A protein has these predicted regions:
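Gly/Thr-rich phosphate-binding beta-strand-loop-beta motif of the actin/hexokinase/Hsp70
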Residues: 1-27, 113, 119-141
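Conserved phosphate-binding catalytic cores of ATP/NTP-utilizing and phosphoryl-transfer enzymes
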Residues: 1-3, 91-121
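N-terminal glycine/serine-rich phosphate-binding loop of ATP-dependent small-molecule kinases
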Residues: 1-7, 11-89
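Short, well-ordered secondary-structure micro-motifs
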Residues: 19, 69, 94-95, 133-135, ...
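A general structural signal for well-ordered alpha-helical segments in protein cores
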Residues: 66, 106-110, 154
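General beta-strand structural signal in soluble alpha/beta enzymes
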Residues: 81-85, 102-104, 122-125
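Short gly/pro/ser/thr-enriched loop/turn and capping motifs at secondary-structure boundaries
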Residues: 87-91, 151-154
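Glycine-rich phosphate-binding loop plus the immediately following alpha-helix
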Residues: 115-118, 142-156
Length: 156
C-alpha cells in the first residue's frame, strides 16, 4: 500500500517549520525565519526534497505570509496548497463563544494531542507566545489562554 506524501508547513510568528511526511513518518524537516524574504527558500526546499508529493498543507498564524506562500507554491509547483484556516473548525469541536478567534496553531496542537494521547487533555505550546489549551473528556476544545513567550517575558 502506498502512503500519502504530504509537505506540512507551519508558519509561526518567528519561525516557519517544514516537514515531509510519508504516512505518519517524518522524513525530512527544516525551518526558516518567518519572513516574506524566505518564501523563495521554502519553494526551493520543497523542490530539493522530491517532487512526488500528494499534498501541501499550510497552517499560518501570519495571514499575509500564509497567503504569499500559497501564491508562490501555486506558481512554482502547479498545485494549490490546503490552507488549515479553511477547514480548522472540522478538526476538533470548538465549544467557545468565538471559535473564529482560536488560531490554527492552537487547533492543530489540540488535534495532534487528541490523536496521540486522547481526551481529556491540557495542551501547552511554548514559543513566541505560550499557549495553554483545555480539551474535555468528549474531545472538545473548551478554552485556552495565551501568555508572552519566554524571550518576550525576559525583555520586559
Amino acid at each position: 500500500m502506498k502512503h500519502l506524501r504530504i509537505i506540512a508547513i507551519d508558519i509561526g510568528n518567528s519561525a516557519t517549520n517544514l516537514g515531509l511526511f510519508t504516512g505518519d513518518r517524518l522524513e525530512r524537516y527544516d525551518f526558516l525565519p518567518s519572513s516574506p524574504e524566505y518564501s523563495e527558500k521554502v519553494c526551493q526546499l520543497i523542490e530539493s526534497w522530491q517532487p512526488d508529493f500528494h499534498h501541501i498543507v499550510i497552517g499560518s498564524v501570519v495571514p499575509a505570509l500564509g497567503d504569499l506562500l500559497e501564491t508562490r507554491i501555486k506558481e512554482r509547483h502547479n498545485t494549490t496548497p490546503m490552507m488549515v484556516e479553511d477547514f480548522k473548525t472540522e478538526l476538533i469541536p470548538l465549544r467557545v463563544d468565538r471559535p473564529e478567534t482560536v488560531g490554527v496553531d492552537r487547533i492543530v496542537n489540540c488535534y495532534a494531542a487528541l490523536r496521540l494521547f486522547g481526551a481529556p487533555a491540557i495542551v501547552i505550546s511554548l514559543g513566541t507566545a505560550n499557549t495553554f489549551e483545555a480539551i474535555d473528556a468528549e474531545g472538545e476544545y473548551i478554552g485556552g489562554a495565551i501568555a508572552p513567550g519566554i524571550k518576550i517575558s525576559l525583555e520586559t
